Amino acid sequence: GWKKFKELSGVLCGKRWSLKLKGRVYRVCVRTVMVYGGETWVMRKEEEGVLRRAERAMVRMMSGVKLRDRKSSGELMSMAGLCEDIVLVVRRSRLRWYGHVLRKTENDGIREVLEVVVPGKVGRGRPKLGWQEEVRKDMERVGLRVGDAKDRGRWRGGAFELPS
């Protein structure tokens, strides 16, 4: 994300355009790069924090406001038109992709990969949260069930109701 931001810093950090327009350019060009492949991520709190901090820093640089100016990040984000949390964007894309996979046929390759069980010994301690558990938590937050994936409208509507 930072690489793309620095490529566009002439536009994003310049004083020529409004913060609202810079926010649109950021959302289309930089944020999409930052969340690319997010459908497959299992995000811990640390990774969520890294994404949020990076976005806040970029918006602060776009606005030209320093910390000593005492403007909150929330104010700057809303001024730039970035009211949606970046972690929420990743969760939505993960749910959208999971619905796409569930609509595939049973013998499709991606369905087989999704339902594979790796043989072998399980290590000691609590296992790390897996991708499917993360998706199940997201589904519970919006009240979706696996069977709802066949109804695209219901699934997509549920994914967009995802609370932060």
Per-region residue spans from a language model:
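Short linear motifs embedded in intrinsically disordered, charge-biased segments
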Residues: 1-164
